[in-house]
């Protein structure tokens, strides 16, 4: 008898009006595009830039090209035809050679290769050279004139290049290593009160 009561209660718990509901927000992409554009300083212009952008047939295949186009760049997009199976397949940040080729072929100013869920990026310079996480962090650190308070240190990981660490210290930054993974980098950034970290 107790099994019967339990099953009846389980069925009652699964009544449709008691379940959560999924909703599609069609304007969410537009809102995200506007947010991203709002983070670009007003004195930074993308006009006249030609960018090759590989979206890895993933989550960013619509919004990323739109962001750069709306900022004024000419965007040559690849990896923007997801079919549910081809995410990261021979494209994106794990296969940047396509972007490297296109940057040279299209005479682009630079290239961007994302991964399928949009949380990893590598850059390609106009000569087709790959810039990985350490390179990108160094460029950001070098360009930053404020090296105090939240900008006084940088978080890398156990995978960060020792040459990168030495170069960062020569710029006057403190440097600490977190365990591998964006979660660990984020946690250490919060703990230290710093703004820049990556892997």
Residue ranges and their predicted role:
Residues 57, 116-120, 128:
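Short, glycine/acidic-enriched loop or turn micro-motifs at the edges of active sites
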């Amino acid at each position: 008898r107790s099994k019967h009561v339990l099953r009846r209660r389980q069925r009652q718990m699964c009544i449709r009006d008691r379940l959560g509901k999924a909703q599609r927000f069609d304007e969410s992409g537009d809102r995200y595009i506007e947010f991203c554009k709002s983070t670009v300083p007003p004195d930074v212009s993308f006009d006249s830039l030609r960018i090759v952008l590989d979206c890895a047939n993933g989550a960013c295949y619509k919004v990323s090209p739109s962001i750069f186009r709306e900022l004024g760049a000419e965007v040559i997009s690849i990896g923007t035809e997801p079919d549910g199976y081809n995410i990261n397949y021979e494209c994106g940040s794990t296969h940047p050679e396509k972007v490297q080729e296109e940057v040279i072929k299209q005479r682009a100013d630079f290239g961007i290769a994302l991964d399928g869920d949009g949380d990893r990026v590598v850059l390609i310079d106009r000569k087709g050279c790959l810039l990985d996480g350490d390179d990108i962090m160094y460029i950001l650190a070098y360009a930053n004139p404020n090296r105090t308070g939240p900008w006084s240190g940088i978080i890398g990981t156990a995978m960060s290049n020792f040459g990168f660490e030495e170069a960062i210290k020569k710029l006057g930054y403190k440097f600490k290593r977190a365990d591998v993974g964006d979660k660990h980098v984020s946690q250490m950034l919060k703990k230290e009160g710093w703004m820049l970290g990556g892997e």
